[in-house]
Design a protein with these regions (language model features):
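A cross-family acyltransferase "interaction/gating" segment
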Residues: 103-106, 141-143, 152-216
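Residue-level preference for the first positions of well-ordered beta-strands
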Residues: 66-68, 139-145
Length: 221
């Protein structure tokens, strides 16, 4: 019964947020400040899943400038856990297929996020170039999942290098975000599903790193 209630509530909540969000974003489409706003709204669903989310971040985190945030990508619950710590103006880089999710895909695009075609290496490299150019033009940060896919309980997967190439090319720091494990932890028929810690670590400077040191930088993160 609890499972059914949660599913119905979450579906209705998400549809309402996405529909009203799309209408709201039409007044300032592709504004990167929207991502944090709606990320936090989705983050409010964490208690519905029986989760208590504890945010940890450096005292000066609000004053960070342009950066690339990298986080571990576990499953769909990242949307109600990691989203709570997103800071404006930060946009995410997601797979192009997200656009086809009803309501959510349209909101994802209107809030200013970048879509990448992972099956086309040329277009993927073009997206990285777009990230670098965006840093040069305005105050903005990017959120990436360097594993490239959801780990689904397999631990931290090997990092792909796109985020690190972009950070070095743009000369911006990398800010790691760590989310404690949620895989095989959440039972939708259970009232309480425990504590999830989302921790933002201090920035890692990329100045001094060259293209031939990508793996060294990734290992440091």
């Amino acid at each position: 019964m609890l499972f059914i209630f949660r599913v119905i509530f979450v579906v209705i909540y998400c549809i309402v947020v996405c529909v009203l969000g799309c209408l709201y974003c039409l007044f300032s489409p592709r504004n990167p400040k929207h991502v944090a706003t709606f990320g936090h709204l989705f983050g409010r669903l964490s208690p519905v899943f029986g989760l208590k989310v504890e945010l940890r971040k450096p005292a000066d985190a609000e004053s960070y400038g342009n950066a690339i945030y990298i986080a571990n990508h576990q499953n769909n619950y990242d949307m109600v856990t990691a989203s709570n710590i997103v800071q404006a103006p930060t946009v995410t880089v997601g797979k192009k297929s997200l656009l086809w999710i009803p309501f959510f895909g349209q909101l994802y695009w209107l809030t200013g996020n970048l879509l990448i075609d992972r099956n086309n290496r040329t277009k993927a490299h073009g997206t990285i170039a777009e990230v670098v150019n965006a840093f040069k033009k305005r105050k903005i940060s990017f959120w990436m999942f360097p594993e490239g896919t959801r780990s689904r309980g397999r631990g931290l997967l090997p990092f792909k290098t796109g985020a690190f190439h972009a950070a070095i090319a743009a000369g911006v720091p990398i800010i790691p975000v760590c989310v404690s494990g949620t895989s095989n932890k959440i039972n939708l028929n259970r009232l309480k599903n425990g504590l999830v810690i989302v921790e933002m670590l201090p920035p890692i400077e990329t100045t001094g790193y060259g293209k031939d040191q990508i793996r060294e930088l990734a290992a440091r993160c």
